[in-house]
Amino acid sequence: MNLEEKKVFLKKNKKIKEFFIADDVKISSFRNEIMSMEHPIFSLKGGDTRIRIYEYGNVIIKIKPTADGIANIFDKDIWIYSISKLQSEINKNNSKISKAICFTPYDFFISTKRNKSGRSYEELRKALSRLKGTIIETNIFYSKNKKKSLSFGLIDSWKILEEKKGKLNIGMIEIILPEWLYVALKNKRILKISEDYFKIRKSIDRRIYEIARKHCGNQKFFKISTKKLYLKTGSTSLLKMFKHNLKRLVRKNNLPDYNIRYNLYKDIITFSKRF
């Protein structure tokens, strides 16, 4: 199906007139949403079906799972892919953007450095289902004089627009971004991340990179206690196991963009920018 055929197909099968074809746009740089980098709304392991409650300062987040578990940090790649494509379109054409995004699994797999096996197509379906079903309840959206509790999903909806030859040749997929994520993108509450993020295979390492990127920012370094880092990752492992994994990461020191050091005596982690 060529580009013009895709557009004709979508117009015939779309009730909402405005849509964005992600395949048409090359990602100039990858972007991540700030709130989800600051707080652990995505699970670090698959199949986590427990209701999770996270408290940090004045922030309370309750995460309710689907039958298949909470959306995990690898499911978040769909988010990152979507907002990166939209931001690239804004940068290039200063275009109005749509919450309705259409893409082929192939473009998603290539962009996020995934393999294109039959299993990958099935896992993409499951990831979309978890994103739709996971519910977040939080008071995070508040100002100094006003606090507001909200409940929302991680995507509003998804559907497969076309399918050929079973699982191995799925056609275009449509997702509708939630309003709050759409607003975050329009208000530039996003941060540029390394394209090597997708090469990070351990979920805990991905989460630690997010925290380093969010807090280090343009500073030369960022320090945090091990216990605070443990809390902010959303890890459900024992603290001693978290420290074991942390020491492994420190030895390898292979996070994109950042060096990581561990002061055992003070129990402090230091992230510093690579130059």
Swiss-Prot record:
Keywords: Plasmid, Plasmid copy control. InterPro entries: BRCT_dom, Replication_initiator_prot_A. Residues 98-198 form the BRCT domain. The keyword ATP-binding does not apply. It comes from the Bacteria. GO terms for biological process: plasmid maintenance. Pfam families: RPA. The keyword Transferase does not apply. This is Putative replication protein.
